[in-house]
Regions:
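Substrate/ligand-engaging "lid" and interaction regions
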Residues: 1-42, 46-525
Length: 525
């Protein structure tokens, strides 16, 4: 069997392989989309194919829409040539259930893929045609947080951005300049309204997108490349809105075991490709079942019926509260605790850690006992139900090949949000005392113990990349497993650093507890 418009006409074969098919005609949908595009999406990778495109498929299947999504790729053009074109932009979606079973569906809601490449005149014009259509309601984004960045780690504008600012809309290469160029095309065609919806997994994502686009536009105005009135258009939220959103769904790289299952079921050409930009992508996407998308409901030109596809539409405060619930209480703190202890104990799978009763007790205590009393409740999702799903289904899912080593990356940049916010809430509470916390200090002690780079058996261990790693390891030089007192006098600078934890752990009254835990962890296995 082949994954394509022609291939899915083999309804018997697909039924035998237990793969659900779209309940609409892809060719008709693609034709309708070309006539009147409504939704364009930047970032043609797995989270888009495995989550966002599925939302539109629900609407198409239910007869609530007759158009698809146009996918635009600004970074890796091979995705369009090697994955989209051969398969008529279709994706074989494999949902990975916690009980080990899978659910398969052909997602056909992407009308076409376009390379957002100004050097490819035909493709560039196709994208401009989408942006100049009065019917266009939204442009959404999953380009990763790095996709919005105009500056390098030193705070200097990247060379590509400097060049884009000097050359204007016709020579736009950076993703943010491409977006600005397309907005300029829309402005020239009548300054029609549109919503620019970042769906990347980062706080205040709409603000990040807006700030970067506005910086490019302002440079073009300053350099006399576009009229000042264009800047006024992009700056007018009644015409160009930048809603915030919260997204949550784990979509790991294509798994070999899934590829084999699909080949055994009779599918051809399921092999992943590694593109010239090092993207690992396949005709299929595997992902967990739980998924959340919360979007600020600000769409000046109308929007698809996303609320009928399981998307929460709400105000900005609710988006922010949902993000805070996830990041400070219900998911991310549990992830970080499992990450540092998983590395120390030699685990390479988060799911395997969830078979360790002590680690399960640790994350349940962090989530339920210490986190929930101060959780931000967004009102649209129950924080307790969210943790129930995280602990009961998501973390133990053996099909999600997430590693503690990956999650341990950049922990110094994360502990202030993931644990510090809860500590601060305890400090300002009339009824709670940070001194009563036990699991959060133990998680922080685990991170400090992890930084030494020696596992629980005394063997050298790789420490994941972190911008503060050299500084932190220098402070901990000489700390030795089996010698608890070797830590004496070496933790003050770390534990008192409010820029790491969001608060000095001395001020919070937790420094002694963390120190005692570190000493206990250093005593040896």
């Amino acid at each position: 069997m082949k994954l394509s418009y022609q291939g899915i006409q083999d309804k018997q074969g697909y039924a035998a392989a237990q793969v659900a098919l779209p309940q609409y005609d892809w060719a008709k949908m693609a034709e309708k989309t070309a006539e009147k595009p409504v939704w364009v999406h930047f970032g043609a990778g797995n989270i888009f194919r495995g989550f966002i495109a599925g939302l539109q498929q629900r609407l198409l299947n239910a007869g609530l829409a007759d158009f698809g999504i146009v996918a635009a790729e600004t970074f890796d053009y091979d995705i369009i040539d090697k994955i989209y074109v051969p398969h008529d932009s279709m994706t074989l979606m494999v949902s990975l259930k916690a009980d080990g079973s899978t659910q398969k569906e052909v997602i056909a809601s992407i009308a076409k893929g376009i390379k957002a490449n100004c050097a490819d005149e035909a493709q560039w014009q196709q994208l401009a045609d989408v942006f100049t259509a009065p019917s266009l309601q939204m442009a959404s984004f999953t380009i990763t947080e790095k996709g919005y960045a105009l500056r390098n780690m030193k705070g200097e504008l990247m060379p590509v951005v400097v060049s884009d600012m000097e050359n204007g809309p016709k020579q736009a290469h950076h993703a943010m300049a491409v977006v600005a160029a397309m907005l300029y095309a829309r402005y020239q065609a009548g300054a029609m309204p549109i919503a620019m919806v970042s769906m990347d997994n980062c706080s205040h994502n709409g603000e990040k997108l807006r700030a970067s686009v506005m910086e490019i536009v302002a440079a073009w105005v300053k350099n006399g490349l576009v009229p000042a009135d264009f800047e006024a258009y992009v700056n007018d939220e009644a015409r160009v809105s930048f809603p915030w959103s919260m997204i949550d769904k784990i979509t790991p790289r294509p798994a070999e075991i899934i590829e084999k299952q699909l080949m055994d079921a009779g599918f051809e050409d399921m092999q992943p490709v590694i593109t010239s930009r090092n993207t690992y992508i396949a005709p299929f996407v595997n992902a967990e079942v739980p998924q959340y998308l919360v979007v600020e409901d600000r769409f000046p030109n109308g929007r698809p019926a996303l609320d009928k596809a399981g998307v929460y539409l709400c105000d900005r405060k609710t988006v922010n509260d949902t993000e805070r619930m996830k990041v400070t209480t219900c998911l991310n703190p549990l992830h970080t605790a499992l990450a540092v202890y998983g590395c120390l104990l030699g685990y390479t799978s988060i799911a395997a850690e969830m078979k360790d009763a002590e680690l399960v007790k640790l994350v349940k205590t962090i989530g339920y006992k210490e986190g929930l009393p101060v959780v931000t409740d967004p009102g649209i999702i129950s924080p307790k139900a969210f943790i129930d799903e995280v602990v009961g289904q998501r973390l133990p899912n053996p099909f999600i090949p997430d590693t503690p080593q990956r999650i341990a990356t950049d922990t110094s940049q994360k502990v202030g949000i993931r644990f510090g916010e809860t500590i601060k809430s305890y400090m300002t509470s009339d009824t709670l005392n940070p001194a009563d916390l036990t699991a959060i200090p133990l998680a922080l002690a685990g991170w400090i113990r992890y930084l030494i780079g020696v596992d629980d058996n005394g063997a050298p261990m790789n420490v994941s990349p972190d911008p503060m790693l050299a500084t932190l390891q220098a402070a901990l030089a000489g700390v030795t497993l089996g010698q608890p007192d070797s830590v004496d006098g070496k933790l003050e600078g770390i534990l008192g650093n409010a820029s790491i934890f969001g608060v000095s752990l001395y001020t919070a009254g937790l420094a002694d507890k963390v120190t005692a835990d570190v000493k206990e962890l250093l005593a040896g296995p």
